[in-house]
Amino acid sequence: MATVTTLSRAAGGRGNPSNKPYLVEVEIDLAAAATAKGSALAANDVIEAITVGANTVVMFAGAEITTAPSGGTGASFDLGITGGDVDAFVDGMTLTGASAGTYGTLANTATPILVTTSDTIDMLLLGTTPDTAGKVRVYACLMDVDSVGSSKEADEVARDYLA
């Protein structure tokens, strides 16, 4: 089993990531993942897709096939948090034979997950022979739940001393 880390993208994205929900996405190229690994992808390989910071709630996450996968036999994947629930968001999405535009069905247990220490949303490859080509868009709606700061007293910023 191998973990491919070079395709992971730091949390950020559209919207205002200051204690408001925001969307993060990354496109996983299966051929690039194999190149980054240094050998063919195999069952039980983990592809880290999205880095999630500490004290962040993953409100939901999902996957969409953007380029039809090929070169595999009976391949599928789970989407979740490998150190926790590996199929928290998508359970057994088919890769082999899937068409572009196919979305993974959210797992019945897909509920918000609080990530208290930095972690990643991962694809866990399943099946006989994972596909060697194709692209999958992984997306997540995140929200920082860290403290918004202090008491907001007037002495917090230098400009307040100028008056």
Give the predicted meaning of each segment.
Residues A2-A163:
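Surface-exposed, low-hydrophobicity beta-strand/loop segments enriched in small/polar/acidic residues
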